[in-house]
Regions:
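Interhelical loop/hinge segments that connect adjacent transmembrane helices in multipass membrane
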Residues: 1-4, 188-195, 204-250, 301-304, ...
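Residue-level signature of transmembrane alpha-helical cores of multipass secondary-active transporters
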Residues: 7-15, 48-49, 102, 106, ...
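Short membrane-interface helical motifs at transmembrane helix boundaries
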Residues: 108-128, 323-345
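Hydrophobic alpha-helical transmembrane segments
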Residues: 135, 164-214, 388-389, 406-430
Length: 437
């Protein structure tokens, strides 16, 4: 199979398994956990998700920079990096920088995360019951955080197919562990052991597959240093602002709907957004899988090949999104009144609400793709518009929640895309013209 299709297929397989495994867990949890255990099950995941704020987009920077440094290198049949000495030393020094950064972040962030969990458990007077599973889960989350950053480094070296295949195997392994644990009635420990064992398996798989490269880079880094902090920190500051803006732009809707219209409608928002973002992620595979190539072509200044690749993949992404929602519309048209389908559809927002959200994410495919293209130049040009958009959407969503029906809850997001699309394109066009002189 051609490498580009391997990347797409492996990424699709991994994402598709996540779409399947979620409902499997949703079916098993109510049968094998008490309501209290179910609550702490999701609490563990929510607290561990604070690690997202320890990353703040750093893993994206890792992928970009490793791709730039790998542009003039290759991996030989024996599993070693080949290239000029200067290129080898530079990518090796960057790898060492990433490891040191991870060590410092993990030593601060994860003790804080563990303490947050302990505070919740102590407040609820269940510390003696849930402390051990929480510590096991937190340790697994720490290993997983480390893994994800290293995987970003390797994906930058154009290893997406192998990495996504490994992620799929680990995700499948994790689902089996959790399902087996629930069936064996070890309750919340099944989640904890699933996280620890799957993340440990990923850790050992990484170093088994890429151990020679890791040893080679670590050895090379001892005799060469490069001021990566000076180059990365200015960009990272803008990434932080973009990350925080994006968090408010896409994560505020369920709690705000809950605030204004109650649990029933917040549930509808949650499940509708899950469906729409799943379609977006499937369509975005065509852009995600060429991210390393975009960075490498920019490093080589091969603008013609870059633009041809980007244009073709963006078209595939847009067509895929339209095709997915076309299939959904046909299915609803013919089966909306069939058997249990009405009961399922009643859990979602109205067709008007879904349509607004679907259109917004269609525009997001453009904006996200332009951002990937421009960020490949080691720049973050959308940080300022991101902040303005986040404030705009937050305020208008507050007004919509208070004054309009739930069907129009996403009107603030829609209005942002109406003015945001041309602004984003102008930034893309102007920066591309400036940087490709």
């Amino acid at each position: 199979m051609n490498n580009k299709y391997k990347d797409i297929f492996s990424t699709f397989l991994n994402l598709f398994w996540h779409l399947i495994s979620g409902p499997i867990m949703l079916l098993l949890i109510p049968f094998y956990l008490t309501p209290e255990q179910q609550g702490y099950w999701y609490l563990f995941g929510s607290i561990a998700a604070l690690s997202t704020f320890a990353d703040l987009g750093f893993s994206n920077i890792v992928l970009q920079f490793s791709a730039h440094e790998y542009a003039f290198l290759e991996i030989n049949n024996e599993g070693y990096l080949l290239g000029t000495e200067s290129n080898l030393k530079k990518i090796s020094s960057f790898f060492k920088f990433v490891i040191i950064w991870l060590r410092n972040i993990c030593s601060v962030a994860f003790p804080v995360i563990v303490c947050v969990g302990v505070i919740f458990l102590a407040r609820d007077k269940v510390l003696s019951i849930y402390l051990l599973p929480w510590l096991i889960y937190a340790l697994g989350s720490l290993i997983n955080f480390f893994n994800n950053t290293i995987l970003s480094f390797l994906e930058g070296m154009n290893q997406i197919s192998k990495i996504q295949k490994t992620k799929f195997i680990v995700a499948f392994f994790n689902t089996l562990i959790i399902a087996a644990g629930l069936l064996l009635q070890i309750n919340i420990y099944s989640l904890s052991f699933g996280m620890l064992l799957s993340s440990s398996f990923m850790f050992f798989t990484i170093f088994k597959t890429y151990g020679k490269i890791v040893k080679q880079m670590w050895k090379e880094s001892k005799t060469f240093s490069y001021p990566w902090k000076k180059e990365i920190l200015p960009l990272f500051k803008k990434y932080i602002l973009s990350f925080v803006s994006g968090y408010f732009l896409f994560q505020i809707y369920t709690p705000l709907m809950h605030l204004f219209h109650g649990a029933e409608y917040s549930g509808k928002v949650g499940i509708t957004m899950s469906l729409v973002t799943a379609a977006f992620q499937l369509a975005n595979i065509f852009i995600y899988t060429i991210t390393p190539q975009i960075n490498m072509l920019i490093e080589k200044k091969d603008w013609k090949m870059l633009d041809n690749l980007f244009r073709n993949r963006l078209l595939l992404s847009l067509c895929s999104y339209i095709f997915l929602w076309g299939c959904f519309a046909i299915f609803v048209y013919f089966f909306a009144d069939f058997a249990f389908i009405p009961q399922i559809l009643s859990r979602f927002l109205s067709y008007k609400g879904i349509s607004i959200l679907v259109f917004c994410y269609f525009i997001q495919l453009f904006v996200n793709s332009w951002a990937v293209y421009l960020r490949g130049h080691k720049q973050e040009p959308y940080w300022l518009t991101g902040i303005f958009a986040a404030v705009w959407v937050f305020l208008l969503t507050l007004l919509a929640g208070k004054m309009l029906s739930p069907d129009l809850f996403f009107i603030g997001l829609l209005s942002q895309y109406i003015w945001g699309l041309p602004v984003s394109y102008i930034i893309y066009r102007n920066d591309k013209k400036k940087w490709h002189k």
